[in-house]
Amino acid sequence: MSVPTVLEKIVARKFEEVAARRVQVSLAELEAAARAADAPRGFARALLEQAARKQPAVIAEIKKASPSKGVLRADFVPADIARSYEAGGATCLSVLTDIDFFQGADEYLQQARAACALPVIRKDFMVDPYQIVEARALGADCVLLIVSCLDDVRMAELAAVAKDVGLDVLVEVHDGNELERALNTLDTPLVGINNRNLHTFEVSLETTLDLLPRIPRERLVVTESGILNRADVELMEISEVYAFLVGEAFMRAESPGAELQRLFFPERGRPTVVGKDPE
């Protein structure tokens, strides 16, 4: 018997987590909370409009830890980070809500969204429609669907639920087979290419460049993971990739927003934004 990969462990734990949450809060209660939530802020629209101007459309990630790197940021205040990202030029936010592997929390999403005007994606491992409704109830504007976690029937089901509750969908792929499945199953304009292999956690920007020619022009490619310096950004922009999801490079910086500005908008001069506003 083979040893489960990190992704397989995460997905198995996610099914257990959803079962426990259903006992605490019914789907009907979540649906009521979703209907009462603030209106979605237009996650896909914000990215598409920014990328259409050939400007970096940055999804800035709020992530305390990861399975491969451990704690990324000890001084972790989601509201402060969200404000810093907004000042630094982010188009959208991504907030990790997975507890066991990324030290995330639902509250982090709520705190980040309340602190700024940016659209927010719930970054988690979605395996059940319950989680989609839960995301809208938390105030999320978009959800992530990871193709390697889902079969085509479940992927389509989750996307349909997302549409019903007013959420955009970012579908994430890592290889050609996953890309083909995503394009054939979903009509979302947002296609994320994860440069990190979720089974081994190895990273290569070639993943985006290899898959790029196979993606129709009407879809927006979001390159995810491995963007660490200006050379990485310029490599993508030369290939007409303008949407980015970046977390680690920002989380390790003293000021996440200043690092965002330095990496993506150097023409604005010396960054003045900070992680926490001085008194």
From Swiss-Prot:
Listed GO MF terms: indole-3-glycerol-phosphate synthase activity; phosphoribosylanthranilate isomerase activity
Gene giving rise to this polypeptide: trpC
InterPro entries attached to this UniProt entry: Aldolase_TIM (IPR013785), Indole-3-glycerol_P_synth (IPR045186), Indole-3-glycerol_P_synth_dom (IPR013798), Indole-3-GlycerolPSynthase_CS (IPR001468), RibuloseP-bd_barrel (IPR011060)
Entry similarity comment: Belongs to the TrpC family.
Sorted UniProt keywords: Amino-acid biosynthesis, Aromatic amino acid biosynthesis, Decarboxylase, Lyase, Tryptophan biosynthesis
GO BP of this protein: L-tryptophan biosynthetic process
Enzyme class: lyase
UniProt cross-references to Gene3D superfamilies, sorted A to Z: Aldolase class I
NCBIfam families: PRK00278.1-2, PRK00278.1-6, PRK00278.2-4
Reactions the enzyme catalyzes: 1-(2-carboxyphenylamino)-1-deoxy-D-ribulose 5-phosphate + H(+) = (1S,2R)-1-C-(indol-3-yl)glycerol 3-phosphate + CO2 + H2O
E.C. numbers: 4.1.1.48
Pathway where this protein functions: Amino-acid biosynthesis; L-tryptophan biosynthesis; L-tryptophan from chorismate: step 4/5
Domain of life: Bacteria
Name this polypeptide is given: Indole-3-glycerol phosphate synthase
